[in-house]
């Protein structure tokens, strides 16, 4: 049903200090909205600094889509306090605008109302906007303003030294990369537990469909709300950001050279569909960066990514080739609407436990057929995860087991990991999280999606969203900073603006020549 990890867990219990120093970082996206709930049409506030170069506050797809980024931290409370400080400062700088507190956008009239993020006049700034122009023309802008939380996670070198026998990060990079790919394969097989527990997009505003038909059997509620009774995360469904043309790429996670070559091939693979669109329109305005399946590597849709911090101008795959996998990025978390900062400590601790389990459990190689099979399990959980009697396919559909049984078996293992982690700090926080979340398998009404759906059914999406946005705005604006200071925010905003100016002044090539050099 799940891999037998008893030996690995016994090893972990004998080496508890191997987990000292887990690295964590969080990226949280949120839309700026006006007091009437519509998407803000204002520019990114200059008081927040330059989105191109700011270390903590930037934008994602749209000018109104804020993205907050924490540095790597080894302390969960400090990590979340840092993220909350970014929210506190931003709430004070946004005037009357609010931060939308859920993943799915609501009051957007048309795709054309969504302004692409702007990054100034430098070649790299214009390239970032052109890439977004390509995303808009390929998939539609509305899909791109769905918000999520990304969790960055790295195991300490001490873990790899004890577990894989490496001496240091450089000489051991192949073993470390293989270890992270093992984690990723297990994540594809069992990561559906994340939307089961934490999915928080069981409903959408009907305006999100923009008049298009959907194959999903939505229930029509008041105020134009569409929902599925047992859904967990419509954000992760085909309504959200998935790329049909990518399904044939066959990017594998069995070893790093194959993963890198698959990624590099994807940005060179031509697409008939995108070629028909053209690179420029008849007026000579850019429509997309190129006509390949992926314009750049970041366009690859994935619920989890192997990562390494890139050097200036370096592609993600080149960074991986240079130094191996440094950390992984989990991309399956919906915005947590119950938290002013979109994520909470229970979620962070659960992800620690689950990702450690994924690193320890055996993970046979995965071919493209099995990768497609894992997607079926995810889809079941995304659309009908709380359905009574729901099953999960084990071993590419060879057997079906009740989701509840698989979840409980997993949590029995996670409790052992929790005890090991707690033994280091003399606390019970990980075990308490385990016990709280394990109850969601006996009672699906405890899941985030069930709790949130009840609220949405009572009050509708718009009313709920605006009430939470106003509540969190008032709360955050009043709270003092914990980790950062207003002076540090001021200095970083100033530094980012100066840095953008320097980049703009140092350009020597035309945009055309610059893009030619990138292809």
Swiss-Prot record:
Enzyme Commission numbers on file: 6.3.2.2
Pfam family, one: Glu_cys_ligase
Molecular-function GO term, any one: ATP binding
Pathway listed: Sulfur metabolism; glutathione biosynthesis; glutathione from L-cysteine and L-glutamate: step 1/2
Transmembrane segments: none
Keywords assigned by UniProt, alphabetized: ATP-binding, Glutathione biosynthesis, Ligase, Nucleotide-binding
EC class: ligase
GO biological process: glutathione biosynthetic process
Catalytic function, reaction form: L-cysteine + L-glutamate + ATP = gamma-L-glutamyl-L-cysteine + ADP + phosphate + H(+)
Record bears the keyword Ligase: yes
Gene Ontology cellular-component terms listed: cytosol
Family the UniProt entry places it in: Belongs to the glutamate--cysteine ligase type 1 family. Type 1 subfamily.
Protein name: Glutamate--cysteine ligase
Organism of derivation: Erwinia tasmaniensis (strain DSM 17950 / CFBP 7177 / CIP 109463 / NCPPB 4357 / Et1/99)
Gene: gshA
